[in-house]
């Protein structure tokens, strides 16, 4: 497992602090042991027979130690403690100051980021408010223009010139199928009569075509089938009487005809009943 450099530095400093603290403890212990040995040596020298004889006159022998400030271990111990404290303070500052600075820098960056976001939000809100104001103003102007705008006036259209079309037959062109004859125009040769149109003057009946109502028979032309006799016209030989038509003068009665009714005048051309 690979540790980050920051954690490695912390562990290295902690190990050195433990080593220094252990070294100070060992040094203080050695100083205390040496001091005790020195005191015992001094006491033994004072209690030797020679010293006892020299001080025999004294009732008591007083053994007094040196003050603590005059002890040999006092200065190294105090110096070591101060040095350890200074080292701990220095190491703490060396480790803590970068951490505090990084944290402060991170807080400042976060604060700047929040301020930038707040500024962006303010700009966006200002743009939205400005856009809404412009839209409302444009809508109000459009509404006012719609109210003020007059109704469109009709555009005058100039009259179109009248075109006169000649629908009469063209010279050199055959008549078109289904084209009715024009009043006052001569009939075209070979043109058959049209149903529903009166016959043209001087137009002979066509073979296979039914005679037109009201058309008189033509001299030299045989009568057409189904053509009723005309008043004042001589009957045609071999023409049978028509139902609903009076018999023609000189026309013989036909077999199957009813006899004259009693009290009814005989029809012209019927012989008297025997």
Swiss-Prot record:
Region (Disordered): 128-274
Biased composition (Low complexity): 128-141
Sequence repeat start and end residues: 177-182, 183-188, 189-194, 195-200, 201-206, 207-212, 213-218, 219-224, 225-230, 231-236, 237-242, 243-248, 249-254, 268-273
Region listing for 3 X 6 AA repeats of P-G-M-P-P-H, in residue ranges: 183-236
Keyword Transmembrane helix: yes
GO CC annotation terms, alphabetical: attachment organelle membrane; cell projection; plasma membrane
TM helices/strands, residue ranges: 11-31, 80-100
Cellular compartments annotated: Cell projection, Attachment organelle membrane
Family annotation (InterPro entries): Cytadhesin_P30/P32
Region (7 X 6 AA repeats of P-G-M-A-P-R): 177-254
Protein keywords: Cell adhesion, Cell membrane, Cell projection, Cytadherence, Lipoprotein, Membrane, Repeat, Transmembrane, Transmembrane helix, Virulence
Protein topology in the membrane: Multi-pass membrane protein
A single GO BP: adhesion of symbiont to microvasculature
Comp. bias (Pro residues): 151-161, 172-274
Region feature (4 X 6 AA repeats of P-G-F-P-P-Q): 195-248
Entry remark concerning the domains of this protein: 13 hexapeptides with consensus sequence were found at the carboxy end between AA 177 and 267 in a proline-rich domain.
Function: Adhesin necessary for successful cytadherence and virulence.
Note: Spontaneous hemadsorption-negative mutants M6 and M7 exhibit a truncated P30 adhesin.
Protein name: P30 adhesin
Gene of this entry: p30
């Amino acid at each position: 497992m690979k540790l980050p450099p920051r954690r490695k530095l912390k562990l290295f400093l902690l190990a050195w602090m433990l080593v220094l603290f252990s070294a100070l403890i060992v040094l203080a212990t050695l100083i205390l042991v040496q001091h005790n040995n020195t005191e015992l040596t001094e006491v033994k020298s004072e209690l030797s027979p020679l010293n006892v004889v020299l001080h025999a006159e004294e009732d008591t022998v007083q053994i007094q130690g040196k003050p603590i400030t005059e002890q040999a271990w006092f200065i190294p111990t105090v110096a070591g403690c101060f040095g350890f404290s200074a080292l701990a303070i220095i190491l703490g500052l060396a480790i803590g100051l970068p951490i505090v600075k990084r944290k402060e820098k991170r807080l400042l960056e976060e604060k700047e980021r929040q301020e930038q976001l707040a500024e962006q939000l303010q700009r966006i809100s200002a743009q939205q408010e400005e856009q809404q104001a412009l839209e409302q103003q444009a809508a109000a102007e459009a509404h006012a223009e719609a109210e003020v705008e007059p109704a469109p006036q009709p555009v005058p259209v100039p009259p179109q010139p009248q075109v006169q079309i000649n629908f009469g037959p063209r010279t050199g062109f055959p008549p078109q199928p289904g084209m009715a004859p024009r009043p006052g125009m001569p009939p075209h040769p070979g043109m058959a009569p049209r149903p529903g149109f009166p016959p043209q003057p001087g137009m002979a009946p066509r073979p296979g075509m039914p005679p037109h109502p009201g058309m008189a028979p033509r001299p030299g032309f045989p009568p057409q089938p189904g053509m009723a006799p005309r008043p004042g016209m001589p009957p045609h030989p071999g023409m049978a009487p028509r139902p609903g038509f009076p018999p023609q003068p000189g026309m013989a009665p036909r077999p199957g005809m009813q006899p004259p009714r009693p009290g009814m005048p005989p029809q012209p051309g019927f012989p008297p009943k025997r």
